[in-house]
């Protein structure tokens, strides 16, 4: 049988099984949970497209991180809370499905609907996401003048996220910007409350 390819890239990708994954989303989540139990540092370089994710896999890292700032920049907009769930989930799905590594995506503040956000990312094969405690018109983590929501509102948001997942192995990661706004003691209080939620 003679195969014809449109270019060398197609030939290489097909003959090196670069478009097939061997692990299901569930298996990737279990693998991540097991690695976390070992309490060792895991390396999750950021991927901005599927090819980068494939390189991360080929090099042998532990997982793939999908940054909200990178998604915003890829769309040509600043990382100030104006990307949508549709935009981020589309690219996150492309990245997550290309390798056998678990993928964690930045869910910003939950895109206005934590339940829908978690269900979407879980259905698209992500291994987890992180949600931050800034107001919806958030600012990228390294920018000044951030505002955070009240502690009880963030706890409610985390509970909604946790209750929305179908697979208990899907990770919900809470992220805080409280240190800059409220100081270290309030930050520790928030982190403990988030963990309990």
Specify the residue positions occupied by each region the protein language model found.
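Alpha/beta enzyme core
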Residues: 29, 42-44, 48-79, 83-98, ...
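Extreme N-terminal cap/leader segments of soluble proteins
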Residues: 18-50
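Short, proline-centered helix/strand-breaking motifs
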Residues: 100-102
């Amino acid at each position: 049988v003679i195969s014809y390819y449109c270019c060398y890239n197609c030939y290489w990708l097909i003959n090196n099984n670069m478009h097939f994954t061997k692990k299901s989303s569930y298996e990737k989540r279990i693998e991540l949970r097991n690695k976390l139990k070992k309490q060792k540092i895991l390396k999750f370089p950021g991927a901005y497209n599927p090819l980068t994710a494939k390189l991360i896999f080929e090099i042998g890292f532990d997982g793939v991180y999908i940054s909200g700032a990178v998604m915003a920049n890829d769309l040509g907009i600043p990382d100030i809370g104006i990307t949508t769930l549709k935009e981020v989930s589309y690219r996150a799905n492309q990245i997550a499905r290309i390798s056998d590594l678990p993928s964690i995506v930045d869910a910003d503040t939950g895109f206005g609907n934590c339940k829908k956000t978690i269900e979407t990312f879980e259905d698209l094969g992500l291994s987890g996401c992180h949600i931050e405690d800034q107001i919806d018109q958030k600012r990228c983590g390294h920018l000044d003048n951030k505002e955070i929501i009240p502690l009880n509102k963030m706890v409610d948001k985390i509970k909604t996220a946790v209750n929305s997942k179908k697979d208990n192995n899907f990770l919900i990661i809470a992220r805080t910007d409280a240190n800059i706004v409220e100081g270290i003691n309030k930050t520790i209080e928030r982190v403990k409350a988030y963990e309990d939620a």
